[in-house]
């Protein structure tokens, strides 16, 4: 199978969601992600795209720090108390 390269957007382009710093991320079809989603009551197949895992809001952009030492993502739905964030796109905090 061909591995898809993740597209990285400038952090400033995150206008549809929140900037989040996530410990890891994976495709919604990955076994570890589907297990996690099922564990919080989301039906398998109801979530698509990139999912952030163990996320917190990024603050301090433009204040001289990167604001995230893990994976910086722009996510459209982070209403699961930081456990997962849905609809994510990787972002570059330096752009």
From Swiss-Prot:
Glycans are attached at residues 23, 77. GO terms for molecular function: structural constituent of cell wall. Disulfide bonds join 14-74, 21-68, 22-55, 75-88. One of its GO terms (cellular component) is extracellular region. Pfam families: Hydrophobin. It is found in: Secreted; Secreted, Cell wall. Keywords: Cell wall, Disulfide bond, Glycoprotein, Secreted. Its main location: secreted. InterPro entries: Hydrophobin. Self-assembles to form functional amyloid fibrils called rodlets. Self-assembly into fibrillar rodlets occurs spontaneously at hydrophobic:hydrophilic interfaces and the rodlets further associate laterally to form amphipathic monolayers. Belongs to the fungal hydrophobin family. Aerial growth, conidiation, and dispersal of filamentous fungi in the environment rely upon a capability of their secreting small amphipathic proteins called hydrophobins (HPBs) with low sequence identity. Class I can self-assemble into an outermost layer of rodlet bundles on aerial cell surfaces, conferring cellular hydrophobicity that supports fungal growth, development and dispersal; whereas Class II form highly ordered films at water-air interfaces through intermolecular interactions but contribute nothing to the rodlet structure. This is Class I hydrophobin 13. It comes from Pleurotus ostreatus (strain PC15) (Oyster mushroom). The lineage of its organism: Eukaryota, Fungi, Dikarya, Basidiomycota, Agaricomycotina. The gene is Hydph13.
């Amino acid at each position: 199978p061909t591995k898809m390269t993740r597209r990285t957007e400038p952090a400033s382009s995150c206008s549809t969601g929140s900037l989040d710093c996530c410990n890891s991320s994976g495709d919604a079809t990955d076994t570890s992600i589907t297990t996690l989603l099922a564990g919080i009551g989301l039906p398998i197949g109801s979530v698509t795209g990139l999912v952030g895992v163990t996320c917190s809001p990024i603050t301090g952009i433009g204040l001289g720090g990167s604001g995230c030492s893990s994976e910086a993502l722009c996510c459209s739905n982070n209403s699961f108390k930081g456990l997962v964030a849905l609809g994510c796109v990787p972002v570059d905090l330096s752009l």
